Amino acid sequence: MTTDTIVAQATALGRGGVGIIRVSGPLAAHVAQTVTGRTLRPRYAEYLPFTDEDGQQLDQGIALFFPNPHSFTGEDVLELQGHGGPVVMDMLIRRILQIKGVRPARPGEFSERAFLNDKMDLTQAEAIADLIDASSEQAAKSALQSLQGEFSKRIHTLVESLIHLRIYVEAAIDFPEEEIDFLADGKVSADLQTIIDNLAAVRREANQGAIMREGMKVVIAGRPNAGKSSLLNALSGKESAIVTDIAGTTRDVLREHIHIDGMPLHIIDTAGLRDASDAVEKIGIERAWEEIRQADRVLFMVDGTTTEATDPQDIWPDFVDKLPENIGITVIRNKADQTGEPLGICHVNQPTLIRLSAKTGQGVDALRQHLKECMGFSGNQEGGFMARRRHLDALERAAEHLAIGQQQLEGYMAGEILAEELRIAQQHLNEITGEFSSDDLLGRIFSSFCIGK
């Protein structure tokens, strides 16, 4: 438990009808007595004057006192709800800081104390920041699911399954004299496969949750005059890029942040790829390749009037060979209004082919639907949770160790190695909820929060 008391403004900085100051720590009741002149009843809203050290009134408003452990942080908490002007808020905070033993809160310190006092786990604490920063209704719903413990429940279920399997495996190791070979009886193999399958399902949902939080990066790439800028405008619904018949009009990277049924996408238009002699155009092409290498998916724009080919290897093998491994690619045959080709998704094998007209907008809805399906997302889904990059990394490492354990079990009946791999996998899963986390990791997470959270 901490011994110091912290204070910060819990509402956003700036002018507002109401401003809230939050105090947490062992001196919260003393602060309430000092500022209001009253001993506050627990969990009662009382309308009182807030005074300075000379008894002069600074403001008046509602005071709320929450004794530990029944508070957000698990400590004694005081909230003063006054008028939301920055001057009034500043005067009240300076008044509270005059009380010995009270200091300003660090960013995220209230949530950090809630975590340290077991009021929430790490995924729930992170969900507070994600809910505040949500850029769409769907993102807010997903963050709320995480805050309510949906992600944590999935992780705890996996951990409990691992614990039970570890007990069984380690018992088989500790009692080798038993006539029954526990490792070979099929139960261990079946239980391990079930855990691997359940982890894979959580990873799929977590990947989707990470996209909901961070957005999917989609890069439009191709030769000059293929219609890349027209497609950016069609997807964004506005004239973001200049469109002309002159090859090489786009010389720099253009970005638009859009939502498709609540799914955030970062759409990036790039310079036409070719052997350029112009120095400025060369820089634009270099930047285009930088964006391509970092993309979640590349939309390979093809001028449908210049070729009938649909396989990217036939259209431009040098371009395909330069793409990073495992990057998603969708072939877009543009200018269907001129070629008369059937619109929409033509085949869903790798890579998917879509025929459209960026100029008229025909077929663009099929592309929007395709982008959602690429990430396994449906705007009508409920119950999804928010995830962060560190969660994905921990889930991936856990899956890797389970796979190693499975190989050792099936190939060598190596119970000791399996037990160790199960232990490491459990440790990685515990990192997600904070049951096993370094102080450095906690510091990085909570330092990104708002001051009063």
From Swiss-Prot:
E.C. code: 3.6.-.-
Protein family according to the UniProt entry: Belongs to the TRAFAC class TrmE-Era-EngA-EngB-Septin-like GTPase superfamily. TrmE GTPase family.
Binding site for GTP: 225-230, 244-250, 269-272, 334-337
Gene Ontology MF terms in the entry: GTP binding; GTPase activity; metal ion binding
Binding site for (6S)-5-formyl-5,6,7,8-tetrahydrofolate: R22, E79, K119, K453
GO BP terms: tRNA methylation; tRNA wobble uridine modification
Pfam families according to UniProt: MMR_HSR1, MnmE_helical, TrmE_N
Residues holding K(+): N225, T244, I246, T249
Cofactor note: Binds 1 potassium ion per subunit.
Compartments, record wording: Cytoplasm
NCBIfam families assigned to the protein according to its UniProt record, in alphabetical order: mnmE_trmE_thdF (TIGR00450), PRK05291.1-3 (NF003661), small_GTP (TIGR00231)
Residue positions binding Mg(2+): S229, T250
Any single Gene Ontology cellular-component annotation: cytosol
Cofactor: K(+)
Record keywords, A-Z: Cytoplasm, GTP-binding, Hydrolase, Magnesium, Metal-binding, Nucleotide-binding, Potassium, tRNA processing
InterPro entries xref list: G_TrmE, GTP-bd, GTP-bd_TrmE_N, GTPase_MnmE, MnmE_dom2, MnmE_helical, P-loop_NTPase, Small_GTP-bd
Functional note: Exhibits a very high intrinsic GTPase hydrolysis rate. Involved in the addition of a carboxymethylaminomethyl (cmnm) group at the wobble position (U34) of certain tRNAs, forming tRNA-cmnm(5)s(2)U34.
Domain TrmE-type G: 215-376
Domain of life: Bacteria
Gene label: mnmE
Name the record gives this protein: tRNA modification GTPase MnmE
Subunit structure: Homodimer. Heterotetramer of two MnmE and two MnmG subunits.
Organism: Vibrio cholerae serotype O1 (strain ATCC 39541 / Classical Ogawa 395 / O395)
Matches recorded under SUPFAM superfamilies: P-loop containing nucleoside triphosphate hydrolases, TrmE connector domain
Broad class of the protein's primary localization: cytoplasm
PROSITE patterns attached to this UniProt entry: G_TRME
